[in-house]
Amino acid sequence: MSKSTAEIRQAFLDFFHSKGHQVVASSSLVPHNDPTLLFTNAGMNQFKDVFLGLDKRNYSRATTAQRCVRAGGKHNDLENVGYTARHHTFFEMLGNFSFGDYFKQDAIKYAWELLTGENWFALPKEKLWVTVYETDDEAFDIWANEVGVPRERIIRIGDNKGAPFASDNFWQMGDTGPCGPCTEIFFDHGDHIWGGPPGSPEEDGDRYIEIWNIVFMQFNRQADGTMEPLPKPSVDTGMGLERIAAVLQHVNSNYDIDLFRDLIASVAKVTGATDLTNKSLRVIADHIRSCAFLVADGVIPSNENRGYVLRRIIRRAIRHGNMLGAKDTFFWKLVAPLIDVMGSAGDELKQQQAQVEQVLKTEEEQFARTLERGLALLDEELSKLKGDTLDGETAFRLYDTYGFPVDLTADVCRERNIKVDEAGFEAAMEEQRRRARESSGFGADYNAMIRVDGASEFKGYDHLELNGKVTALFIDGKAVDSVSAGQEAVVILDQTPFYAESGGQVGDKGELKGAGFSFAVSDTQKYGQAIGHIGKVASGSLKVGDAVQADVDEARRHRIRLNHSATHLMHAALRQVLGTHVAQKGSLVNDKALRFDFSHFEAMKPEEIRAVEDLVNAQIRRNLAIETNIMDIDAARASGAMALFGEKYDDRVRVLRMGDFSTELCGGTHAARTGDIGLFRITSESGTAAGVRRIEAVTGEGAMAILHAQSDQLNDIAQLLKGDSHNLGEKVRAALERTRQLEKELQQLKEQAAAQESANLSSKAEEINGVKLLVSELTGVEPKMLRTMVDDLKNQLGSTIVVLATVADGKVSLIAGVSKDVTDRVKAGELVGMVAQQVGGKGGGRPDMAQAGGTDASALPAALASVKGWVSAKL
């Protein structure tokens, strides 16, 4: 009996654990502190800094089952998903890694043992082929002489992409970064399937399928193309779980493995589809995986960056559901079946199931409002098309008006063998894209700008003043030996009490001083393992090697500590009041206030806000001890400590406990007891995106200042109303009721005045061919009263044409009324449009009533004078 996908995943991890590897949990799909990546797309992403020598772990061997998304590239990447056997937006990458431990020999032998060992995957050895980089004789010899693969099944692959190291068997992360030769393992499905071995003209067939890539990471590629040896040669491997599952389950398509069979059946059930071979079922089954896990990792549908990629995938799935005949929202209903088929890999998703379902449902409901109209417009445009290409302007209109991502439009067009002018679409999108780039969350890559050898020891939990030594200085990202008065710089110390910005808490400010110099620190940031003090030399000069006294701004740090501790209390309170679906999505803690973004489906009710505020203040009054402990990450999670989904943690973590109320992983600075916070006050609650709410709050002195300001305001209002704060509500209600009554009386007076004005105007009408014509500019009449006056005049005059105008705040308001027996000759919309054009405006409406506006009041008399001639010509 073949293994299930979940069993294959576990067997891989168990095998490498037996070989001394640390089993490391999958990292978030949103790369942590790596602006070069849109999504996590390989198992090695979370170890990038380890390979570069910028980070250290307490293990030298690791194994993972990493969730990956590849959907941010060209549009046809997404279009292929569901239509080929192996294209996916979401997949799991099984990997084993060596950080300067074992190298080629063990990496190759481990792979062979797992694939062919009787107790493991037990694949027939004669079915396996391997490739090596053309000049990698060492790997070739290991395969041939030590493993025993016949030489005719070992293929050397050279630089086949037109440049040095541009080879299928030379792996590189990008234009820069870790790289090296690799060896790949292929499975031969047999001669009943078309295709040839790698390197042959028929290599693109489906007979020989790559199942494992083993990278021998030896170099760090620089921007100028040079290859710098890495500190220690390392190994990075990747094997697609879905691909190896297809091999072990004896099927040729990834969509035929157990996981996808079950998902496809669920898709058919919620959409009402009966043909299980329909490609749309594959599309939706793939897309629910990427969409659900992206939302769980904090990505929200939007029109920018990661959020736009997510929106594209969701809307493509919805459109395929529409093609299958789905009559109601269906996509969100697939989250539960997905959790079931993912096994242990779905545990984190299950924790956020309600939030993920709500976000997907909201997006589906929003798109459903425009999907049918957009498809109708596209169908109309395609039916009129003369050639085989839809113009970019129409594609952009579908995007801008109906929310159609261009790849969804291309999907529809492809079914009719029509292309989309994507260059034209991109041209129309350029302004939006420019704005998106400017507002992008991808900031500067500080580690790329400043490379610091060595580390700084942070001692700021216990000290706010400390002696240290300058180990490096930087100006504009470049290392220097010294800095002088007036220069802005980054100062690296061997040890420091300054907290570097992390986990939402801002960096410390303060002063570095020594013999003959003073350096004002305006911010503190991390640079790899080092801590950088950013600021300006206030006096004197300092150089590398100087002794310094580092003084943190104590009062500012104290306020930050209170706000950070209050954030933890509020997080726990939100989960109690709103539900356990609440998860932190972002935070900002500074010395003035705190801001907390969290997952929730709707605006909080006033009573919920009050309940959270009361609960936090209750914990403050309990004066709970705030304790920290350092422990293994697994032990911390087992103790119930909340970890931020997607946050990057070391193997040893700091657990912050506030009595029995809150336990979280946190590296920030905190109060000693909850009572130190003094008082907690929520100042606002708002939405930042679909499914994400934001609370802003203040503590301590800041909260007292808010209360004092509110009290002063109430006293001022009480004095104005000649009352006191005790009966203020009653006084305000009475004043509002009196105001409403006066407004009602005023409106009645205005209507009476308008009726009288209409009666006066009716005598000024002149007759043209049996039709009364009245044209007049009125003064002191509100624009909204003109319609009432026109109706009155039409009733009084019978067959009539009325044009009234007034000017308020320099703007012209026009209205035209035509009795129904005259509308066959004179249309009110045409008439008012003719007048509006002369006063710099436009308008329109029904044949019997139309209105318009204009900006040129000086042209109004002449415009009104032209009405008689225009009407006479029509009558």
Curated annotation (Swiss-Prot):
The keyword Acetylation does not apply. GO terms for molecular function: alanine-tRNA ligase activity; aminoacyl-tRNA deacylase activity; ATP binding; tRNA binding; zinc ion binding. Keywords: Aminoacyl-tRNA synthetase, ATP-binding, Cytoplasm, Ligase, Metal-binding, Nucleotide-binding, Protein biosynthesis, RNA-binding, tRNA-binding, Zinc. Its cofactor is Zn(2+). Zn(2+) binds at H564, H568, C666, H670. It comes from the Bacteria. It is an enzyme of class 6 (ligase). GO terms for cellular component: cytosol. GO terms for biological process: alanyl-tRNA aminoacylation; negative regulation of DNA-templated transcription. The keyword DNA repair does not apply. It is found in: Cytoplasm. Binds 1 zinc ion per subunit. Its EC number is 6.1.1.7. InterPro entries: aa-tRNA-synth_II/BPL/LPL (IPR045864), Ala-tRNA-lgiase_IIc (IPR002318), Ala-tRNA-ligase_IIc_anticod-bd (IPR018162), Ala-tRNA-synth_IIc_core (IPR018165), Ala-tRNA-synth_IIc_N (IPR018164), Ala-tRNA_ligase (IPR050058), Ala_tRNA_ligase_euk/bac (IPR023033), DHHA1_dom (IPR003156). Catalyzes the attachment of alanine to tRNA(Ala) in a two-step reaction: alanine is first activated by ATP to form Ala-AMP and then transferred to the acceptor end of tRNA(Ala). Also edits incorrectly charged Ser-tRNA(Ala) and Gly-tRNA(Ala) via its editing domain. HAMAP family: Ala_tRNA_synth_B. Homotetramer. Consists of three domains; the N-terminal catalytic domain, the editing domain and the C-terminal C-Ala domain. The editing domain removes incorrectly charged amino acids, while the C-Ala domain, along with tRNA(Ala), serves as a bridge to cooperatively bring together the editing and aminoacylation centers thus stimulating deacylation of misacylated tRNAs. Belongs to the class-II aminoacyl-tRNA synthetase family. This is Alanine--tRNA ligase. The lineage of its organism: Bacteria, Pseudomonadati, Pseudomonadota, Gammaproteobacteria, Enterobacterales. The gene is alaS.
